[in-house]
């Protein structure tokens, strides 16, 4: 025994081809007889088979034409075997005692259980194969007789694919029942046909059975239409259609879910779709006719057909069933099938046969069965009539579409052609320029390696260069600071000495003002005084030898003489630093520290591959690259010294002077042209800034003149970088200004003595006063040397407000009125730049000189008053001094004060004095 799958779908078999033919031949019996070939021997519940799957007919031999259960009316003239005409289906219900499976179960719901689990018994055939062959031969003879009828029903047969012998393919011969897994649509169509069949023996077959098998898209012929009309007329005459729902007890529901509602509920019974067991196939009929009950049908299939034929039949069945699929989400207990209406134009409408598909179990379907009518609805989706204009419009649209497509393709073609031309040109250009790529790559790789090695070398040597540069700057700074400190000490010593004499203050013999021991301090002061006097004597002797003794004034010379010890120490340290600088690159190849070698490498790059040279911004990198090497050469360069070498005459300057200068025309944006100016900006200006802060002495006229000279040279020679907008230039000028202010605050000192002390011109206080006065005038001249570099406002603030009005005018107040004062005033006015007074408008001078002009007017009045009552010679000298004062006032453009002095003292040569200024 074999256990089959739980899910069993039992359906009624479609009419076979032979049954259709026999049905057409047996149209003559009385109307009350069942139509031939309709399969009415099987009731709605599948009456020809018991639930166990066995035949209802008892065993025993009977003629094939009358007693074979599978052939029925097809071979026996439309009556079942052993039945009289008019008996209907009663013989089919007789052999219920032969069922063996129901006796095996005593349960009340054995029918439902047996539907889910069927048991088959395989019995061997007791007849010979000759009987089978004989039956086949007789079957073929019957097939030839009904050939004409088969052609009429060809459209109906297209719904059921048959094999070459006319047998309906049995898809589940081994199970004994039909499990329609791949043919759900066929099952639903058969169930719908089953609905139209009558349940009594006198019911007429549904006339639409042949119409339902019409394949969608197939045009019916005249014979098909005639047969349909004839069957429809017979259905009207009989009028004994009985709905299947009237006998729910004969039906059997196949439930796919064990949780469905109970069979006892009438509502559930009404909602179920009734399936009938598929009728036996021709092979099964033959097998039953020869007495092989429950035999395995696969043996016959294996003997008759091969596997290929079976697959072909499967394909034909799937092709024939061209019906939309059933909705998958229907409830299990309802199992309603709604057939979708075809959206295309029905072909039957052209023959005047309206039709429509209706759902099974609907009210419309029931009314059709009751009234024995076949109502068909006219489809709403009629086809639009085809006109010439419509065809022309479609053709025109098609033509426009093709033209547009052609235009697009043509544009694409032209685009591809142009792309091809461009690609060809690019290939030619690249092939022509690829000759030197290898050499270029090799050269650039060499330059890359060279630059990396150079940077690694500089990263190691630059800290050493910075240390040496700091050492040399510190050395010069110490020397300058030492000289400034010595000058300040000398001024303090003389001031304290002469102040005590003038005030005649009594001081403690051994304590200073801070309570310290004065013995040690006085000892150092005596040693400084001795050294100071010795230096003055040596300078005086030097002036006598040069013949400048007559023009010299005390205080105009700079006391920058050093002792031999200081000079020796300074030179030793300087030499040591110079030797250390020479050892910086002693372990390096010349190509990595020589400016000429480095320059030649980049010049080769520039001349061969200028584009890549420019793209790499080498012109902007060279000043920074040469910076350490140039600073090393400028290590001992100090423009304050007399023997200092001009930087433009040094080797690095001459080597880089013509860098980038080639025969070809220079580009406007070529940065190599500005190589030297950039080096001056990055190297020279920072060097000068350090010198101005730490080494320059504004009291020294020589140093000031050299600083002014180098600054003017940079301004005039490199105007693109040395200007007021340049950052490094601003830093340099700021350093100069701060140094001048510091000198003005720390080094200028003007003593104040009573006139009776200054009467003795050989006394110490008088000489010290004169020396400080002339040193202040000298500083005034040094400040005013920066005219043209600093602004007029800055210079006037420093020289006039900070020095003249603050210190020098104070000295004029304590000086003797006479020739000496006029001489001092003349020297002060000579320090002023002439450009200050050339563009003045009106009769007034600059506002800062107003106090100085008032002093000159007061000096003229004093000279005139002192000459009253004196001799004519003294009066004549006084008058000459007044004229000189008028001339001095006119030289500083103080015309209002000059006219006032001239009118007060009857100076008639005023105009000539002004013009002679």
Curated annotation (Swiss-Prot):
There is a cross-link at residue 149 (Glycyl lysine isopeptide (Lys-Gly) (interchain with G-Cter in SUMO1)). GO terms for biological process: mRNA splicing, via spliceosome; muscle organ development; positive regulation of myoblast proliferation; positive regulation of transcription by RNA polymerase II; regulation of skeletal muscle satellite cell proliferation; transcription by RNA polymerase II. It is found in: Nucleus. Changing residue 538 to C: Found in a family with global developmental delay and myopathic hypotonia; uncertain significance. Residues 40-50, 73-85 have a biased composition (Gly residues). Residues 16-28, 183-193, 257-268 have a biased composition (Acidic residues). The modification Phosphoserine is found at residues 16, 154-155, 158, 191, 262, 295, 557-558. Residues 378-558 are annotated as: Necessary and sufficient for interaction with PAX7. Residues 161-172, 234-256, 542-554 have a biased composition (Basic and acidic residues). Residues 1-11 have a biased composition (Basic residues). There is a cross-link at residue 149 (Glycyl lysine isopeptide (Lys-Gly) (interchain with G-Cter in SUMO2)). The modification Phosphothreonine is found at residue 563. Residues 1-123, 143-205, 229-275, 362-381, 530-564 are annotated as: Disordered. InterPro entries: GCFC2-like, GCFC_dom. GO terms for molecular function: DNA binding; histone methyltransferase binding. Interacts with PAX3 and PAX7. Interacts with WDR5; associates with a histone methyltransferase (HMT) complex composed at least of RBBP5, ASH2L, SET1, SET2 and KMT2A/MLL1, KMT2D/MLL2, KMT2C/MLL3 and KMT2B/MLL4 through direct interaction with WDR5. Adapter protein linking the transcription factors PAX3 and PAX7 to the histone methylation machinery and involved in myogenesis. Associates with a histone methyltransferase complex that specifically mediates dimethylation and trimethylation of 'Lys-4' of histone H3. Mediates the recruitment of that complex to the transcription factors PAX3 and PAX7 on chromatin to regulate the expression of genes involved in muscle progenitor cells proliferation including ID3 and CDC20. Belongs to the GCF family. PANTHER family: GC-RICH SEQUENCE DNA-BINDING FACTOR, PAX3- AND PAX7-BINDING PROTEIN 1. This is PAX3- and PAX7-binding protein 1. It comes from Homo sapiens (Human). The lineage of its organism: Eukaryota, Metazoa, Chordata, Craniata, Vertebrata.
């Amino acid at each position: 025994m074999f256990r089959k799958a739980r899910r069993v779908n039992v359906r009624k078999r479609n009419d076979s081809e032979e049954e259709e033919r026999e049905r057409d031949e047996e149209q003559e019996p009385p109307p009350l007889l069942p139509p031939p070939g309709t399969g009415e021997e099987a009731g709605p519940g599948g009456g020809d088979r018991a639930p166990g799957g066995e035949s209802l007919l008892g065993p025993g031999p009977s003629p094939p034409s009358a007693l074979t259960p599978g052939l029925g009316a097809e071979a026996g003239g439309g009556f079942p075997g052993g039945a009289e005409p008019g008996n209907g289906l009663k013989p089919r219900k007789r052999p219920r005692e032969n069922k063996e499976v129901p006796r095996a179960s005593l349960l009340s719901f054995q029918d439902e259980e047996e539907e889910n689990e069927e048991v088959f018994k395989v019995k061997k055939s007791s007849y010979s194969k000759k009987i089978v062959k004989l039956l086949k031969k007789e079957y073929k003879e019957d097939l030839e007789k009904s050939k004409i009828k088969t052609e009429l029903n060809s459209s109906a047969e297209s719904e059921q694919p048959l094999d070459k012998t006319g047998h309906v393919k049995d898809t589940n011969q081994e199970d004994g029942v039909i499990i329609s897994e791949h043919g759900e649509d066929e099952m639903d169509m058969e169930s719908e046909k089953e609905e139209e069949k009558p349940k009594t023996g006198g019911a007429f077959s549904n006339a639409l059975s042949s119409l339902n098998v019409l394949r969608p898209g197939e045009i019916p012929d005249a014979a098909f239409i005639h047969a349909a009309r004839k069957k429809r007329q017979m259905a009207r005459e009989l009028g004994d259609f009985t709905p299947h729902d009237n006998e729910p007890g004969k039906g059997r529901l196949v439930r796919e879910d064990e949780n469905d509602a109970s069979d006892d509920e009438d509502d559930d019974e009404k909602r179920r779709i009734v399936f009938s067991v598929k009728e036996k196939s021709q092979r099964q009929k033959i097998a039953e006719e020869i007495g092989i009950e429950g035999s395995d049908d696969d043996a016959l299939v294996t003997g008759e057909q091969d596997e290929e034929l079976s697959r072909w039949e499967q394909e034909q069945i799937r092709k024939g069933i061209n019906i939309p699929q059933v909705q998958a989400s229907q409830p299990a207990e309802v199992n309603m099938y709604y057939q979708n209406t075809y959206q295309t134009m029905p072909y039957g409408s052209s023959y005047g046969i309206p039709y429509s598909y209706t759902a099974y179990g609907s009210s419309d379907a029931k009314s059709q069965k009751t009234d024995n009518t076949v109502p068909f609805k006219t489809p709403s989706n009629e086809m639009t009539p085809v006109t010439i204009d419509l065809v022309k419009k479609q053709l025109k649209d098609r033509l426009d579409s093709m033209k547009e497509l052609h235009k697009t393709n043509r544009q694409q073609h032209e685009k591809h052609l142009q792309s091809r031309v461009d690609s060809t040109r690019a290939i030619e250009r690249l092939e022509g320029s690829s000759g030197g790529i290898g050499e270029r790559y090799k050269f650039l790789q060499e330059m890359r390696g060279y630059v990396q090695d150079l940077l690694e070398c500089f990263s190691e040597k630059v800290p050493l260069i910075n240390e040496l540069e700091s050492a040399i700057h510190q050395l010069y700074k110490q020397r300058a600071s030492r000289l400034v400190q010595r000058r300040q000490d000398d001024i303090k010593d003389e001031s304290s000495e002469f102040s005590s004499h003038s005030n005649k203050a009594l001081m403690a013999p051994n304590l200073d003002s801070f309570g310290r021991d004065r013995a040690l301090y006085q000892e150092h002061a005596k040693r400084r005084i001795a050294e100071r006097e010795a230096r003055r004597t040596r300078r005086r002797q030097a002036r006598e030898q040069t013949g400048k003794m007559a023009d010299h004034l005390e205080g105009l010379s700079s006391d920058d003489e050093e002792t031999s010890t200081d000079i020796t120490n300074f030179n030793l340290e300087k030499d040591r630093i110079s030797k250390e600088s020479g050892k910086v690159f002693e372990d390096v190849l010349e190509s990595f520290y020589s400016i000429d070698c480095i320059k030649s490498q980049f010049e080769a790059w520039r001349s061969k591959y200028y584009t890549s040279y420019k793209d790499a911004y080498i012109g902007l990198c060279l000043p920074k690259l040469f910076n350490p090497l140039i600073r090393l050469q400028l290590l001992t360069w100090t423009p304050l010294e007399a023997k200092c070498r001009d930087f433009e005459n040094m080797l690095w300057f001459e080597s880089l002077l013509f860098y980038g200068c080639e025969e070809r025309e220079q580009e406007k944006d070529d940065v190599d042209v500005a190589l030297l100016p950039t080096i001056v900006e990055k190297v020279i200006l920072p060097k000068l800034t350090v010198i101005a802060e730490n080494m320059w002495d504004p009291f020294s006229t020589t140093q000031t003149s050299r600083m002014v000279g180098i600054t003017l040279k940079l301004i005039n020679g490199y105007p693109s970088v040395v200007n007021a907008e340049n950052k490094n230039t601003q830093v340099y000028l700021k350093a100069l200004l701060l140094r001048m202010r510091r000198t003005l605050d720390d080094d200028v000192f003007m003593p104040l003595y009573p006139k009776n002390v200054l009467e003795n011109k050989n006394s110490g206080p008088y000489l010290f006063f004169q020396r400080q006065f002339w040193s202040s005038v000298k500083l005034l001249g040094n400040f005013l040397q920066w005219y043209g570099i600093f602004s007029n406002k800055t210079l006037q603030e420093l020289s006039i407000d900070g020095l003249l009005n603050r210190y020098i005018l104070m000295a004029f107040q304590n000086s003797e009125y006479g020739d000496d004062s006029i001489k001092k005033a003349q020297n002060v006015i000579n320090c002023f730049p002439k450009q200050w007074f050339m563009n003045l408008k009106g009769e007034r001078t600059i506002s800062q000189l107003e106090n100085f002009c008032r002093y000159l007017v007061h000096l003229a009045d004093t000279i005139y008053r002192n000459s009253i009552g004196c001799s004519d010679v003294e009066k004549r000298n006084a008058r000459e001094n007044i004229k000189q004062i008028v001339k001095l006032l006119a030289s500083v453009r103080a015309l209002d004060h000059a006219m006032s002095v001239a009118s007060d003292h009857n100076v008639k040569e005023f105009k000539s004095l002004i013009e002679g200024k």
